[in-house]
Amino acid sequence: MDPFTEKLLERTRARRENLQKKMADRPTAGTRTAALNKRPREPLLEANHQPPAPAEEAKPSSKPSPSKRRCSDNASTPDAGAENKQPKTPELPKTELSAVASHQQLRATNQTPQVSLLSSDKELTASDVKDASSVKTRMQKLADQRRYWDNNVSPSSSPPAHVPPKDIIVSPPKPQIPDVGNDTPVGRRGRFANLAATIGSWEDDLSHPFVKPNNKQEKPGTACLSKESTTSSASASMNSHSVKQDTTSCSQRPKDTTVNKAVCSGQLKNILPASKPASSVASTEVSGKSKPLAIKSPAVVTSKPNENVLPASSSLKPVSANSSPQKTERPASRIYSYQSASARNELNNNTPVQTQQKDKVATSGGVGIKSFLERFGEKCQEHSPAPLNQGHRTAVLTPNTKSIQERLLKQNDISSTASLAQQQKKEREKELAALRGRYDRRNVWTKQEDEQQGTFPETSSNLPTSDVASCSETKRAEASGITSEKSVSGHFHPNMAEQVSSPEKIPTPVQSQLPLESPRLVNEGNTGNVACEVEMSVDGSIEEINSSGIITNIFSDVLEQHDEEGEEVDECLVEQVETDTDDEEREDEEEDALNISSMSLLAPLAETVGIESPKALLSPSNKVAAGNGESCDRKRSGRFQKSHVLRAESNDGIGSSEENQNLLYSIDAYRSQRFKETDRPPIMQTIVRKEDVSSRLQDKKTASPLSVNIKQKMKTLSNEVNLQQTVIHQASQALNCCIDEDHGKGSETEAEAERLLIVATEKRAALIAELNKIKNEGPQSQKKNVSNESAPSRGCISVSEMFLPLKADFVCNATQRMDSANYYFFLMIRAGAENIVASPLTSITSTMKGDALAFPTTFSLEDVSNDFEICVEVYSLVQKKEGHAPDKKKKTMKSKAITPKRLLTSITKSNMHTPALASPGGPNAVRTSNFVLVGSHKLTLSSIGSNKFPLDKVPFLSPLEGHIYLKIKCHVNSSVEDKGFLTMFEDVSGFGAWHRRWCVLSGYCISYWTYPDDEKRKKPIGRINLANCTSRKIEPANREFCARPNTFELITVRPQREGDRETLVSQCRDTLCVTKNWLSADTKEERNLWMQKLNQFLVDLRMWQPNACYRPASKP
């Protein structure tokens, strides 16, 4: 025997001994009342309805009697001889449980005198005297219990003071048990029939504690119960046990030995049929025919589940009623979704007791889910002292049980602890809703409140009683395959917790898919059904099915309450449940008994983790569903769309959760992320370079000069030539009309026409020259400009604030002789054929500022290279005014009457006086402008920094002084930047040291810090100004002087300062201090990249700002 089994057996023995001591210490009713608040530890066997037996070790019994098997499954039997006597002790509790259950459900059936119970108690006492001393003690306690119970049932009975608290619950089974021990099986059946009749005569007595003593006695398994007694107790326990009790047994069950596990699995298969017939049939029938009922029961919704259930039940025929409380409870829990209205009412009547137990559980464990060990410890403490608690307690606080508790707590006063726990749960759910709402674009809990008038936890807690039953009934009516269960399902609602604890093992097809499928069935029927199914599927912690997936599906169902696809989806799901039952049962047997998830409260967040679809949660269920047909797939996909944030429109979209893979998987992670971002915003930095930045830099260079298609460019130039030709033609026509003063001769309008004519003419000539150049050279001219690797970055040039000074004597004479002539000037700025701009027309009379003409035009060029050339040209026009004699003649001529002959003569005379005659070609002839070029200047990169430039080609008699004033600015579009670690060589007290620095290349300097984070928070340790660099080109350091690999050298110069001295890195020459900067990169590639970027910086700096940096020394 392995050490684990030995320890398990030792603990079981210790618990039994402890139970015996406690049972001996509390013989009075007062002691029992006090014990209600505390439960002793229980063995690791199935604990749903059976607390461990005090005296005996668990030994599997080989006897065929059903009672014996039941005892062996739950606990070991001490002696073969005591078989009849000891079973009585467990039988009493079972009968008590059955009595309580039937009392809840069949209270109006039959009313049998309680004298028979008393007589049975006496018989039991007599048989107990013959047993060993331990047996005698237990039997005396049982007798006291019976008496006390009899007193409670009928107020006229003897006072219950001497009766132990455990015996209070079950009186009817007790009379039968003594008979069972002494009589033949036939007598047992008769007594069981009497017991059923007695149970039927009972009336509701909420103050009467039930079930707990039965559980304790049953668990020890000291004696074997008769078939009849076992069956009756099992059926009664099925009916009497509350959902909480069932949950408790399930939670403890994982710790049971392997024998118990096998029994549980078998029981689960048989549970549904056995429990359903037992509840549907009268208690009298249960005593004798529990086996066949279990086999014949129509409880299974689908054909496949029925097949699975029948063989299981047949294998356990002696325990047809599933004497073990776990077995009975599990089927009940599956059927729980289909409870009838009568069952609801009975459960509501028993609500006070359940409420007390649930309050207790909530106080100890809280609403949240605890680990299996914690829940088992609490159950062991609460089991023995309070039979009341055993009858209806929920030791396992699974989400199902929790929701049921909340419901009952609402109906009766909720304890302060439970209220606080519920409030915390709601807060967590709100946070979950906020997280999910970011993608759902709606508030999940708001929709639930609109539909259910409450949050999900409240609804689920309210549903376990009558609401659940009504929901289940409505659902059954809708589903085609579930109609057969209507009659039976109503009686098994107390056992719903069993299904919660082990949904996979339960044979009912609807429940087999607890995590996902069963909730859908219920939701389709009614809104109440949603909560009902929720509770059934929440406790998936024991199975392989992830509890988070179950709760996720539950939440999705709550969101889908108003779907109109109920009936069709139900049919599809029923078919799926049939095929899924077998797989889930096999998986459940292989699962870890302690696999209880403590994160089930955070289950809704499972959607935002890597879970792609329901496939990740329920692989078998989804596989089956996939083959159910297009209609079923369509509806299921619609449901999954709601349950998952992806909200895909088809099944194909369900599986892709790439959008949610980066989401946080828990509330704690979300909070820590939020606080972290608030306290310290992240600084995005790239420490390791994974891409070839040099290639990116080369791409920028190549792409900077816009490469235009040659044909497209030629077409554009041709269009522009045609446009300028049109302007020339129109300007010529205007000038041809200016024949005298009346027609604009000598006016500013004529001068403007002359300006348009000269500008259009110059543009046309430049465009034609460019077009011919492209035709002759082709695209080779562009390639030459781009091919240079060390070409500097391109920049922007702007020319503004242009002034044209005039001679001082000319200005004085012009002001004195204003009527002599008009002088017009304008500037034409050229930067290639495509960039020609003309300034507005200016004259001495209109735009004179002092002794200079001002031109407000601003000329800008984008994306130009450093070898740009801008030509500024000055054009002048002189209009001489005519004498007054012609005006007098015109006046005298106008006074005469106008005749055709006179008109012709006047036109001829006026043409004679026109200084600029029209072209001989007529009014449509093309003219040549009278503007004359009087000065020009070319601006280049070297012009930057100056504002006065000489004019070329200025005539001697021109009024221009010979200079032009303008402001030229340039901006380099250099985007070369880099960051990374470099190891710098420094002189430390006369010794060379290499220090690793975080270097940033920006703004024509290299700034360095110790750590990357310091860049945003601290001033740099130092800077290397590239403007002071005298290296013609940055190259690797000479290995003769620097042996460190991947090192490059950067030489800088600065004016010498006082206190400068020579070091390992600096030397003083004349008035300059020369510094050698050795910078070492981590890899050769990084070194080459740094060198390339630094060289680009130097080229840009020296080309665009030649006066702002030191020029490299000329080579000798």
UniProtKB/Swiss-Prot annotation:
Annotated protein name in UniProt: Anillin
Single GO molecular function: actin binding
PANTHER family named among the record's database cross-references: ANILLIN, ANILLIN/RHOTEKIN RTKN
Subunit structure, as described in the record: Interacts with and bundles F-actin. Interacts with the non-muscle myosin II heavy chains myh9 and myh10, and these interactions may be enhanced by the phosphorylation of myosin II regulatory light chain by mylk.
Biased composition (Basic and acidic residues): 1-25, 85-94, 120-133
GO biological process: actomyosin contractile ring assembly; mitotic cytokinesis; positive regulation of bleb assembly; septin ring organization
Biased composition (Low complexity): 226-242
Domain (PH) ranges: 975-1099
Role: Required for cytokinesis. Essential for the structural integrity of the cleavage furrow and for completion of cleavage furrow ingression. Plays a role in bleb assembly during metaphase and anaphase of mitosis. May play a significant role in podocyte cell migration.
Matches recorded under Gene3D superfamilies: Pleckstrin-homology domain (PH domain)/Phosphotyrosine-binding domain (PTB)
Subcellular location(s) of the protein: Nucleus; Cytoplasm, Cytoskeleton; Cytoplasm, Cell cortex; Cell projection, Bleb
Biased composition (Polar residues): 101-119, 304-326, 336-356, 453-472
Source organism of the structure: Xenopus laevis
InterPro entries for this protein: AHD (IPR012966), Anillin_N (IPR031970), Cytokinesis/Rho-signaling (IPR051364), PH-like_dom_sf (IPR011993), PH_Anillin (IPR037840), PH_domain (IPR001849)
Coiled-coil residue windows: 416-443
One GO CC term on file: bleb
Keyword check for Cell cycle: yes
Record region (Interactions with myh9 and myh10): 142-254
CDD domains: PH_anillin
Chain segments carrying region Disordered: 1-188, 205-257, 304-363, 443-522
Main location: nucleus
Keyword annotations from UniProtKB, A to Z: Actin-binding, Cell cycle, Cell division, Cell projection, Coiled coil, Cytoplasm, Cytoskeleton, Mitosis, Nucleus
Sequence segments annotated as region (Interaction with F-actin): 255-418
